[in-house]
Amino acid sequence: MSSVYTGNLTVAIFGQSHAPAIGVTIDGLPAGFPVDMDALSRFLARRAPGGSPLSTPRREADAPEFLCGLSGGRTCGAPLTAIIRNTNTRSQDYDALRAVPRPGHADYTAQIKYGGYQDAAGGGHFSGRLTAPLCIAGGICMQMLAQKGTVIAARILSVGSVTDETPFDGPAALQGRAFPVLDEAAGARMQQEILNARAAGDSVGGVIECVVSSVPAGLGAPMFGGMENRLAQLLFAIPAVKGVEFGAGFGAARLRGSENNDPFAIQNGRVVTTGNHAGGILGGITTGMPLVMRAAFKPTPSIALPQQSVNLETKTQTELRVQGRHDPCIVPRAVPCVEAAAAVAVLDAMLESYGTEGLSWT
């Protein structure tokens, strides 16, 4: 399976939703960085299941165990491997799904690709559970970036038809917010939207907006090595993401050039733009302005309502009712996943520009 991000950093994610463990190996991290385990645990807890009535009832501690790559609490230059043990699985909930693919899930495409040998329990390697090891990698990258002054923060922009219209400038406005929105009234309506979907046996999607502040100009490259390319590749590794945009995104198509162009200016002796429709990237290269991106998440496909499917063994039409424990909306738990994906991409680009010697913490 294609579960390895290869750049100046190599991030390999392994495991299945109901396997004994899931994990990640990260190669290319600069040596000598002191990993703050308490901060990493708090970051992982934002993604962990079972912590809210808005999420799945499945509870997992998501406590990472580091097998190698650290010495005395610091990165040592060797590949870093960490695992999270799966302790609360109910694989029997998925027995009936081996022949009947769930609409909206990867069950059918996995069956075609892997000939029935795939692990179907909990979605196997296709599960959103695999975002936990992504958050281990991204959480460490975020700590490294923060010590260089680059800060990443994401917020819930919308859930269903409810949108937080408040402009998002960065992390300061989100301090202490358990539900990461800027407009608390809109946040309350979003939470009610999720609860209403759950009560109806249904689910709802949404959009997460992420801002990366204090990014050096000059990161990235044209065409295939572009900053948008790297970010999008990592964002689309989050299973429920169906769309990604940067800056004005698809809204730029409705503007004229005179509206979309960001004029240049000098501020405190450095070049800036007076707007940021470009989302901090021009020609695949960072401008020095904040990176602004949004990821659209589909509604969780596992719902309690009856759905039409087929029995792959008998080749007959059948009705499916999904059992098990599922999120009515994945968006609240996906906020740190978006931050993690952005962190890996930005640190990878910094390593390309400066090398490990130029990003030393010793």
PLM features: what roles do these ranges have?
Residues 14-20, 135, 201-204, 208-317:
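Glycine-rich anion/phosphate-binding loop at the beta-strand->alpha-helix junction
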Residues 302-362:
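Internal helix-turn-beta structural module
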